[in-house]
């Protein structure tokens, strides 16, 4: 999820400043997983022990996404993925006595390295590519910008298919998807500092397509194997999603134009019809509000663009005779020219009323002591023969809104030492990483390196692949040392580590008043994770590396997690709808509770608490 324009430098700078919060959150997730593994591990071991008598008939060796070679035999434990990586410098006993802390610090360092590469090098190069290809904002956001935020998950999935042959990659995809939907929305709702009005079209569009993608994924993994055409279908589905984003404006106009227009009485649908407690459909007829009840009107701030027709339809006042006359003259009983003039007059009056309300002025005193207001039906009449009176009746000119301060470009540099003491400590720890990246990757954000954006793209991609490999390696060692299965480490620790930077960026964007964009983009980026993050590795394995082969899937444990993912999407959209499409603290607490429930159920399923699902991981005394 990346933003263009002047907000991106501010977002990147703030993300660097929030490094302690990110590290603290990831460590808290790891501590929660360790406690849960100790709590549910014994229960799951008993369930697995009681099920050993049926293992030869019901169990195939747990090698998620591993190519079928016909030589697998039934075993009483699952081979750990740690053997697919280079040998660690420490033994298992040394790690259990404290050396694992070094691996945790290394994994956190890789999380930060991935965030730096994506924010300061990879995403700017993608923006330059989009500019050269003349892509629209929607298409660029659905393709290159989505790739910029989901590249760590994609490489984790590739490593899971071609190196570990385990479930750490798909666990990261599923866990990151749930984290993006629940945690990002929850954090924005709790800490945005304002109530964010969500656009129903963007949320419903991405949620419906994402639901379709998850259902297709469940159907494909149900038979415990992936063939070449199934990976191809996932990629084709993403191509269709790009087309939807390309024609997003036309589709939105088609689905929203269903309700009666104020101007001509033709069917037009307002976005406020779905999810607005003020709208009941009775105000489509201009004559209805004449005898209706005046509802409590929400307060509207002074915005650059005010949707006057939607505001009037959502909270119509009780009109008296002068305004009622204007409303009647915009019906189809009058000619088009009269309707246009009266509609323009209503819009001008309503705009003036909103400006006065925003400035705390609800009425204007006249010379004879009366007050002039739309609410009491006194519409001002201009007298061209008395310019002095017209000048006195005109409202004072409004001061122009202050222009936003320009955001200075904050280029990453190893030689800019911060002034604060805490920032200096962080600068010392991150200096080797920043120096290495600045020396090896040209920063195409700078004017002199702008023409080398393709070199930036290639080198940044290589560094992302290297950091992702080290990250998955360290997380695999941590999980093996603590006795946590790879899929749980992927769903929790890896998902949080790769998604917390995006969560912090979404919070920053929400505080800037763009919370709707942040929330809708989180769901849209999950479409990339499922369709591309899984479709591309599966397609490469079955069509390029080994044509005609299949990818083995442990659907017994994976289907449960994907069903939980599907349920979390449905419950989140339902909660947003019941909350009148508003993102506030109440909705934030609701989705965070859903995330905690998802983690608990996923961990209990993987530890065989409810029923036997997975074999325990093979342990070695080294």
From Swiss-Prot:
Transmembrane segments: 98-118, 143-163, 173-193, 201-221, 225-245, 458-478, 480-500, 527-547, 558-578, 587-607
Species this chain originates from: Homo sapiens (Human)
Residues linked to a glycan: 69, 76
Gene Ontology annotations of biological process type: amelogenesis; calcium ion export across plasma membrane; calcium ion homeostasis; calcium ion import across plasma membrane; calcium ion transmembrane transport; cellular response to high light intensity; cone photoresponse recovery; detection of chemical stimulus involved in sensory perception of smell
Annotated Alpha- repeat ranges: 139-179, 495-526
Keywords linked to the UniProt accession: Amelogenesis imperfecta, Antiport, Calcium, Calcium transport, Cell membrane, Cytoplasm, Disease variant, Glycoprotein, Ion transport, Membrane, Olfaction, Potassium, Potassium transport, Repeat, Sensory transduction, Signal, Sodium, Sodium transport, Symport, Transmembrane, Transmembrane helix, Transport
Protein name listed in UniProt: Sodium/potassium/calcium exchanger 4
First and last residue of the signal peptide: 1-38
Disease: Amelogenesis imperfecta, hypomaturation type, 2A5: A defect of enamel formation. The disorder involves both primary and secondary dentitions. The teeth have a shiny agar jelly appearance and the enamel is softer than normal. Brown pigment is present in middle layers of enamel.
Topology feature Extracellular, residues: 39-97, 164-172, 222-224, 479, 548-557, 608-622
Keyword Ion transport: yes
Tissue specificity field: Expressed abundantly in all regions of the brain, aorta, lung and thymus. Expressed at lower levels in the stomach and intestine.
């Amino acid at each position: 999820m990346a933003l263009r324009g002047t907000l991106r430098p501010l977002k990147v700078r703030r993300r660097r400043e929030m490094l302690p919060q990110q590290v603290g959150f990831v460590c808290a997730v790891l501590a929660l997983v360790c406690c849960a593994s100790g709590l549910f591990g014994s229960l799951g071991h008993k369930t697995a022990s009681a099920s050993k008598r049926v293992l030869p008939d019901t169990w195939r060796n747990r090698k998620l996404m591993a190519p079928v070679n016909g030589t697998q035999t039934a075993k009483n434990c699952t081979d750990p993925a740690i053997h697919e990586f280079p040998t660690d410098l420490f033994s298992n006993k040394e790690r259990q006595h404290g050396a694992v802390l070094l691996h945790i610090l290394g994994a956190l360092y890789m999380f930060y390295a991935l965030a730096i590469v994506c924010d300061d090098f990879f995403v700017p190069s993608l923006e330059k590519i989009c500019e050269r290809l003349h892509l629209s904002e929607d298409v660029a956001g659905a393709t290159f910008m989505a790739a910029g935020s989901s590249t760590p998950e994609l490489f984790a999935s590739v490593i899971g298919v071609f190196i570990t042959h385990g479930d750490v990659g798909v666990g990261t995809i599923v866990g990151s998807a749930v984290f993006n939907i629940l945690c990002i929305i929850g954090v924005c709702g709790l800490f945005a500092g304002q109530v964010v009005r969500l656009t129903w079209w963007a949320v419903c569009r991405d949620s419906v397509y994402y639901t379709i993608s998850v259902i297709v994924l469940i159907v494909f993994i149900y038979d415990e194997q992936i063939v070449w055409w199934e990976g191809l279908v996932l990629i084709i589905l993403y191509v269709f999603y790009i087309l939807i984003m390309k024609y997003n404006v036309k589709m939105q106009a088609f689905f929203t134009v269903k309700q009666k227009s104020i101007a001509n009485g033709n069917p037009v649908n307002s976005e406020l019809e779905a999810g607005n407690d003020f709208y009941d459909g009775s105000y489509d007829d201009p004559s209805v509000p004449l005898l209706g009840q005046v509802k409590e009107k929400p307060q509207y701030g002074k915005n650059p663009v005010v949707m006057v027709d939607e505001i009037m339809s959502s909270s119509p006042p009780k009109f008296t005779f002068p305004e009622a006359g204007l409303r009647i003259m915009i019906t189809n009983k009058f000619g088009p020219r009269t309707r246009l003039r009266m509609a323009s007059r209503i819009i001008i009056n309503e705009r003036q009323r909103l400006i006065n309300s925003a400035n705390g002025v609800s009425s204007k005193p006249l010379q004879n002591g009366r007050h002039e207001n739309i609410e009491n039906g006194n519409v001002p009449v201009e007298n061209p023969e008395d310019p002095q009176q017209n000048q006195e009746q005109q409202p004072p000119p409004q001061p122009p809104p202050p222009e936003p301060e320009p955001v200075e470009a904050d280029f990453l540099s190893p030689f800019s030492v911060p002034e604060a003491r805490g920032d200096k400590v962080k600068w010392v720890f991150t200096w080797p990483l920043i120096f290495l990246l600045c020396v090896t990757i040209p920063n195409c954000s700078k004017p002199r390196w702008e023409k080398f954006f393709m070199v930036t793209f290639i080198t940044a991609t290589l560094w992302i692949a290297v950091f992702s490999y080290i990250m998955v390696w360290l997380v695999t060692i941590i999980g093996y040392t603590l006795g946590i299965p790879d899929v749980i480490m992927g769903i929790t620790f890896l998902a949080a580590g790769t998604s917390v930077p995006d969560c912090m960026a979404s919070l920053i964007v929400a505080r800037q008043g763009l919370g709707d964009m942040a929330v809708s983009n989180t769901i849209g980026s999950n479409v990339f994770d499922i369709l591309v993050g899984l479709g591309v590795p599966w397609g490469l394995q079955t069509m390029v590396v080994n044509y005609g082969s299949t990818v083995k899937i442990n659907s017994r444990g994976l289907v449960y997690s994907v069903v939980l993912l599907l349920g979390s999407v449905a419950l989140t959209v339902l909660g947003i709808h019941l909350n009148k499409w508003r993102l506030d603290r109440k909705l934030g607490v609701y989705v965070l509770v859903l995330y905690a429930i998802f983690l608990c159920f996923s961990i209990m399923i993987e530890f065989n608490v409810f029923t036997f699902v997975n074999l325990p991981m093979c342990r070695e005394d080294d």
